[in-house]
């Protein structure tokens, strides 16, 4: 989990 949203496609 990074600084994206609720997606794992970051």
UniProtKB/Swiss-Prot annotation:
<protein>
    <recommendedName>
        <fullName>Unknown endosperm protein B</fullName>
    </recommendedName>
</protein>
